[in-house]
Amino acid sequence: MNLYRDVLWPLLFSGLRADPEAVKMGLLRALHWIDATQATGILSALERLFCYRDPRLAVSLWGLTFPNPLGLAAGFDKDGLALGVWPSLGFGFVEVGTITPQPQPGNPKPRLFQLPQDRAALNRMGFNNQGAAALAERLRRLQQRPIPIGINLGKAKITPLEEAAADYLASFRLLQDLGDYFVVNVSSPNTPGLRSLQAAEQLEPILSALQRENQKRKPLLVKIAPDLDWPDIDSILELAQDHQLAGIVATNTTLRRDNLKTRFLPGRGIPFAPAESRPILAEAGGISGAPLRERSTQVIRYIHRSTQGKLPIIGVGGIFTLADALEKLEAGASLLQVYTGWVYEGPGMVPQLLRGLARSSPPSPDVTLPPENTPVGQIQA
């Protein structure tokens, strides 16, 4: 039995009706304390429980070494509060953000909901973050970097769409020396008009501005929505080639509701008592988790085939099991990210997936990892 999945999760979210965002922030505060105090005993215990290292899992991409292909997706640790802890939880890389040039509070609460019938979540966070300068300072203080760190960039809510390039550029200028790769997020459904920036004529000036500034040739990717039509994806792939992008992150959350079992969004209320509900069709926000799995894999496969496998893909969306992970890798993903599945399954999900992937992987002759007993803090990406 999975104690977290089968006991703790139902108690928190179904029984006590805890606010998912409050639970997440409580966990982040705890991880931040571990990070800030360098609680070596706790970090060592986490490593023993959740780290699984095997040379067959290593991935070499963009001049970086990923100890394994499983990363934490953007949105969980937006401000890099626990950068020193994620390696001890087994992740092969972490993506922070979405970051905007200035701090912003995001959308009104409540803005994060669990949909257990669908093993999904609905969020309308709205890029709440402490701003690029705060993240830059945190990254400068980071003493060790055992796994690559990606930075997800976004537009502020108050910035007009026609000035979006300036926002992405401002954050990139502050952070370009501190991130290992960068992701242009133009696909969140929770910032008004943002998805329109996926159109070629709107995306082109953003990519042009960033690549002109990108003198150190940091890997630059675009994160796309699962709801795009194939011709729209083709246009983005043409831009990716024209602007020498390093890859695509596929995909963000979906606006579709037609395949959900959940009909009403759970309301807040007294624990273990009936609560008010609201029709989910009337609720704004993007859906992540299991309902996204099939479509995100379709998009990965389409990109892989359209580019003859020449454009690396970070696959994200609906990964809960080894079969889910293998499906995306076989579709053409080079790396994987998890978020909602990790929230549902718990921290034991990472080593479980990695063990399965190692059994399914051929040897990786071009990458050598440190011995299995090397402390994670001594591994340099």
UniProtKB/Swiss-Prot annotation:
Keyword Membrane: yes
Entry keywords, A to Z: Cell membrane, Flavoprotein, FMN, Membrane, Oxidoreductase, Pyrimidine biosynthesis
Subunit structure as annotated in this protein's UniProt entry: Monomer.
Gene it is expressed from: pyrD
Pathway(s) this gene product operates in, as recorded in its UniProt entry: Pyrimidine metabolism; UMP biosynthesis via de novo pathway; orotate from (S)-dihydroorotate (quinone route): step 1/1
CDD domains to which the protein is assigned, alphabetical: DHOD_2_like
Cofactor note: Binds 1 FMN per subunit.
Name of this chain's protein: Dihydroorotate dehydrogenase (quinone)
Residues where FMN binds: 74-78, 98, 152, 185, 223, 251, 289, 318, 339-340
Function: Catalyzes the conversion of dihydroorotate to orotate with quinone as electron acceptor.
GO molecular function annotation: dihydroorotate dehydrogenase (quinone) activity
Catalytic reaction list: (S)-dihydroorotate + a quinone = orotate + a quinol
PROSITE patterns registered for this protein in UniProt: DHODEHASE_1, DHODEHASE_2
Cofactor: FMN
